[in-house]
Swiss-Prot record:
It comes from Mus musculus (Mouse). This is Serpin H1. The modification N6-succinyllysine is found at K93, K295. Residues 1-17 form the signal peptide. It comes from the Eukaryota. Binds specifically to collagen. Could be involved as a chaperone in the biosynthetic pathway of collagen. Glycans are attached at N119, N124, N394. The modification Phosphoserine is found at S140. InterPro entries: Serpin_CS, Serpin_dom, Serpin_fam, Serpin_H1_serpin_dom, Serpin_sf, Serpin_sf_1, Serpin_sf_2. The lineage of its organism: Eukaryota, Metazoa, Chordata, Craniata, Vertebrata. Belongs to the serpin family.
Length: 417
């Protein structure tokens, strides 16, 4: 079946090349502003946090798809540090491994990193991002905190009255929808703890490929959630030259796909066969990823990926607590008095909600590539079963996103032996 698919993809690539007009001049590679030493240090720390938090969430049996922006999580910790005192503040810095940095270094460094990496224009990606801190109607946010949190973290602030829970939830979800231009219509259906502060991050991210997928190389396929459960999905296909590595010992393959302007890349790691991702996740560390990437080589690869939007909401409260953020979430111990001027607030929930769109769009591709000999026998990267993916900034090495796709949207197709 896969050999037939490979042949079909190669024939389609050649046939479609004749149809494509000479491409427009591709956008010149973007120019990222040089990061300060503080921002570079915090980029490294946020990457370490990414793997720790991902591993903690991967062990949660209730979690299927994972979608995290380590940069945004780091900014949330910075916000807690900004609004906290004593152990409450120091724990937030410790989870970020930034204990030895002065408070001002943390806030200015994270603010710089957030502005640089979320600059959609420079990076030619679609990334709509909003952060809002909701406080109980009985609490007023301090002016200094409102000003500083807006300056460093672009965080908005609102009071919310949960006596009318339906109206409160509607308000949160409407804000998220407006922030993401309707791509994320719902953050949550319920809020369990309504007597504390709610930090809500709402995001929509859409990669624009350095070389787009042809819109006609799209069809309906099956995605094997497990060996016995398959859902129908739309798949998009293209053949091109990519950094690629096949680890035969660990039975996994990985591919790196540059995004437009080449300031960042999407990296996908996938087991050779359908299996739970637990084995691969145990291998995944910052050091191991670096080692794998060092072995990648430019090769012809026929890539097939699910097409569509993945929507995921995580309440990170308990997962951050597992990494050491215990005081801020404890009603009896939290000291967030820099937020409100009083010790009358704790962090009840940290909602991290993302819509991530896998689509064909990107820079025009050069049809002349399909006459090259090396594309006649490409490696096959057929993502029809669970995989891990990362969006990586090529300058700082910071991760814009880390996630896994276990169950895409789709109806059950059939049972397989």
């Amino acid at each position: 079946m896969r050999s037939l698919l490979l042949g079909t993809l190669c024939l389609l690539a050649v046939a479609l090349a004749a149809e494509v007009k000479k491409p427009l001049e591709a956008a010149a590679p973007g120019t990222a502003e040089k990061l300060s030493s503080k921002a570079t240090t915090l980029a490294e720390r946020s990457t370490g946090l990414a793997f720790s938090l991902y591993q903690a969430m991967a062990k949660d049996q209730a979690v299927e798809n994972i979608l995290l922006s380590p940069l945004v999580v780091a900014s949330s910790l910075g916000l807690v540090s900004l609004g906290g005192k004593a152990t409450t503040a120091s724990q937030a810095k410790a989870v970020l491994s930034a204990e030895k940095l002065r408070d001002e270094e943390v806030h200015t460094g994270l603010g710089e990193l957030l502005r640089s990496l979320s600059n959609s224009t420079a990076r030619n990606v679609t990334w709509k991002l909003g952060s809002r801190l909701y406080g109980p109607s009985s609490v007023s946010f301090a002016d200094d905190f409102v000003r500083s949190s807006k300056q460093h973290y672009n965080c908005e602030h609102s009071k919310i009255n949960f006596r009318d829970k339906r109206s409160a939830l509607q308000s949160i979800n409407e804000w998220a929808s407006q922030t993401t231009d309707g791509k994320l219509p719902e953050v949550t259906k319920d809020v369990e703890r309504t007597d504390g502060a709610l930090l809500v991050n709402a995001m929509f991210f859409k990669p624009h490929w350095d070389e787009k997928f042809h819109h006609k190389m799209v069809d309906n396929r099956g995605f094997m959630v497990t060996r016995s459960y398959t859902v129908g999905v739309t798949m998009m296909h293209r053949t091109g030259l990519y950094n690629y590595y096949d680890d035969e010992k660990e039975k996994l393959q990985m591919v790196e796909m540059p995004l437009a302007h080449k300031l960042s890349s999407l990296i996908i790691l996938m087991p050779h066969h359908v299996e739970p991702l637990e084995r691969l996740e145990k291998l995944l560390t910052k050091e191991q990823l670096k080692a794998w990437m060092g072995k990648m080589q430019k090769k012809a690869v026929a890539i097939s990926l699910p097409k569509g939007v993945v929507e995921v909401t995580h309440d990170l409260q308990k997962h951050l607590a597992g990494l050491g953020l215990t005081e801020a979430i404890d009603k009896n111990k939290a000291d967030l008095s820099r937020m409100s001027g009083k010790k009358d607030l704790y962090l009840a929930s940290v909602f991290h909600a993302t819509a991530f769109e896998w689509d064909t769009e990107g820079n025009p591709f050069d049809q002349d590539i399909y006459g090259r000999e090396e594309l006649r026998s490409p490696k096959l990267f057929y993502a029809d079963h669970p995989f891990i993916f990362l969006v990586r900034d090529n300058q700082s090495g910071s991760l814009l996103f880390i996630g896994r796709l276990v169950r895409p949207k789709g109806d059950k197709m059939r049972d397989e032996l």
